[in-house]
């Protein structure tokens, strides 16, 4: 929240002799005091964010735990082990801490998987990844892997039949690694459907097990919805889309009529299009 500084200038009137009063009135008005600029807010460091997430309030934790299903949709054949990676090189979503707590709680309650958490690039190496069945990118942004060995470690991980999952901003990564962007399915290209707005969603694959929670019905939800660069979006030929924006609802489709989004209309062209929010794909032998 921006701080506003209000400066009040008080003018004092003095009684002057009659012969000087007229002359005084002709004097140029005094200059107003310059407004003092608010002090710039200190930019949070990565350690500041981590400290904030470590102090997630009990009320916030309770609300997350209340929303988590009591059991898995399907019974797992075995307990899996996942590595949750949450580093950011770009915009930092404040919800990362809540996401980490949610995943830890699901792992503990449902016992379908166990979860380890890291923000250290060095942990993305072949030897370490052998311990895991999946990598979850929790709202990571602008990830730039440090070397070819890390990139190859993820490719080998996928070739071994393992899995990668991405939450929200996972689509805002790998701008210097085309194969990584293809693995995710696309790259961020703005969010005309902004945070705080309530948007309609439809089930593109209502019978899929991951959509059972919606009981075959579309829904409205408050969230920030990404769209993806046409040149990087893998499209419906490569992606099995589970949920997308319901463009039949005027509240959703009319957003693109805003003059601010003319560049997007030029990019995507006229007519209906699919804006996915959840999908699956096979990639290099993994999923």
Where are these regions (language model features)?
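Short, surface-exposed loop/helix-turn segments at secondary-structure junctions
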Residues: 252-271
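Short, surface-exposed beta-strand/loop micro-motifs that present aromatic residues
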Residues: 70-73, 227-231, 266-268, 272-285
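Short alpha-beta junction capping motif
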Residues: 82-85, 129-175
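Short, solvent-exposed loop/turn elements at domain surfaces
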Residues: 89-95, 144, 249-253
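Aromatic-Pro/Gly-enriched surface loop or interdomain linker
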Residues: 22-27, 32-131
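N-terminal export/membrane-targeting signals
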Residues: 1-23
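An acidic, glycine-rich "communication" segment
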Residues: 167-257
């Amino acid at each position: 929240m921006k701080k506003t500084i209000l400066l009040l200038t008080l003018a004092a009137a003095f009684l002057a002799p009659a012969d000087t009063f007229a002359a005084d009135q002709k004097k140029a008005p005094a200059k107003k005091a310059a407004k003092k600029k608010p002090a710039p807010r200190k930019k949070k460091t990565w350690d500041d964010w981590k400290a904030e997430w470590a102090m997630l309030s009990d009320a916030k934790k309770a609300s997350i735990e209340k929303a988590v299903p009591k059991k898995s949709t399907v019974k797992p054949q075995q307990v899996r082990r996942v590595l949750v990676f949450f580093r950011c090189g770009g915009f930092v979503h404040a919800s990362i801490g809540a996401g980490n707590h949610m995943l830890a709680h699901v792992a503990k309650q449902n016992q379908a998987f166990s979860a380890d958490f890291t923000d250290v690039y060095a942990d993305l190496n072949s030897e370490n990844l052998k311990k895991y069945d999946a990598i979850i990118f929790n709202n990571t942004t602008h990830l730039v892997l440090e070397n070819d060995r890390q990139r190859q470690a993820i490719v080998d991980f996928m070739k071994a039949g393992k899995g990668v999952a991405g939450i929200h901003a996972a689509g805002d990564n790998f701008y210097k690694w085309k194969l990584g962007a293809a693995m995710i399915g696309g790259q961020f290209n703005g969010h005309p459907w902004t945070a705080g707005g309530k948007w309609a969603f439809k089930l593109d694959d209502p019978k899929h097990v991951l959509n059972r929670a919606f009981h075959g019905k579309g829904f409205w939800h408050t969230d920030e919805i990404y769209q993806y660069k046409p040149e990087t979006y893998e499209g419906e030929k490569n992606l099995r889309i589970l949920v997308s924006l319901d463009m039949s609802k005027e509240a959703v489709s009319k957003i693109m009529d805003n003059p601010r989004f003319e560049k997007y209309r030029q990019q995507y062209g006229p007519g209906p299009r699919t804006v996915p929010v959840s999908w699956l794909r096979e990639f290099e032998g993994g999923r």
